[in-house]
């Protein structure tokens, strides 16, 4: 019997703290720890972390050639096959970093989209994730095609599918438009359901909180639902509705 090979990504995590960054843009030990948790959620393993302090990002390679070479050495010494940045990168920065480090590079947004691709269960959720992935990868199409050849599967390659994202920009733009139309139809159905609840005077309560805060656990306790509630980030992606009767 043929045994299916399971790809375990080993990654070096990199963050940049620049003086010119806003609090939302900057990286820190805390955000790198969260990035490691995201990596574990995606099925990967962290083999090292690098946090760099600079006045401004390097316009070409974001962290500079010297630091990129340091990360490349960490990749080699740790047996890593992936570098993930805590900050968002431009297409040109992605290309420059891959050329310098000779390793596939992802940023935080790509990692989160990969997790979403694994977790989406409903039709609406899957449509939303596919649309987000196409919108993210469209300006990065050339870099992503090169990454696909290096990664060969695993983190950063899940979702719409390799063959679709290797096609031309015209197809992707057409697919984006199609997804938007399908989502509009799904939202019409949701709107009808909301109007029905309003008409029937059904009170609506929303549970809101950060990822892994315990929303699904609380909903299960209140309603007797059986929603998966694991201790990991973005475990429940889709919106869930349950009925609660108060006595």
Regions inferred by a protein language model and the residue ranges of each:
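Short alpha-helix plus adjacent loop in nuclease-associated cores
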Residues: 110-132
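Conserved G1/Walker A P-loop phosphate-binding module
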Residues: 3-11, 21-22, 144-247
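Flexible beta-alpha connector loops of hexameric P-loop NTPases
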Residues: 20-26, 57-61, 119-124, 163-164, ...
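A charged, well-structured terminal subsegment
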Residues: 131, 135-148
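Short acidic/polar capping segments at secondary-structure boundaries
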Residues: 110-111, 139, 178
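N-terminal accessory targeting/assembly segments
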Residues: 1-108, 112-113
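A residue-level signal for conserved active-site and pocket-lining positions in enzyme catalytic cores
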Residues: 35, 134, 172
């Amino acid at each position: 019997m043929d045994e299916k090979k399971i790809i375990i990504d080993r990654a070096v995590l990199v963050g940049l703290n620049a003086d010119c960054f806003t609090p939302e843009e900057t990286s820190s030990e805390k955000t790198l720890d969260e990035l490691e948790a995201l990596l574990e959620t995606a099925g990967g393993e962290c083999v090292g972390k690098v946090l760099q302090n600079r006045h401004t990002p390097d316009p070409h390679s974001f962290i500079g050639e010297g630091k990129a070479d340091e990360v490349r050495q960490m990749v080699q010494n740790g047996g890593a096959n992936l570098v993930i940045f805590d900050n968002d990168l431009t297409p040109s920065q992605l290309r420059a970093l891959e050329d310098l480090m000779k390793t596939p590079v992802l940023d935080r947004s790509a990692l989160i989209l990969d997790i979403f691709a694994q977790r989406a269960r409903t039709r609406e959720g899957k449509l939303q994730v596919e649309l987000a992935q196409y919108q993210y990868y469209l300006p990065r199409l050339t870099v992503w095609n090169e990454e696909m050849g290096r990664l060969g599967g695993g983190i950063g390659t899940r979702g719409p599918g390799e063959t679709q994202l290797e096609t031309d920009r015209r197809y992707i733009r057409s697919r984006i438009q199609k997804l938007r139309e399908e989502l509009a139809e799904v939202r019409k159905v949701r709107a009808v359901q909301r109007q029905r609840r309003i008409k029937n005077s059904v009170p609506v309560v929303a549970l809101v909180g950060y990822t892994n805060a315990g929303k699904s656990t609380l909903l299960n306790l209140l309603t007797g639902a059986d929603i998966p509630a694991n201790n990991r980030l973005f475990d429940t992606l889709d919106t869930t509705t349950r009925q609660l009767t108060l006595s």
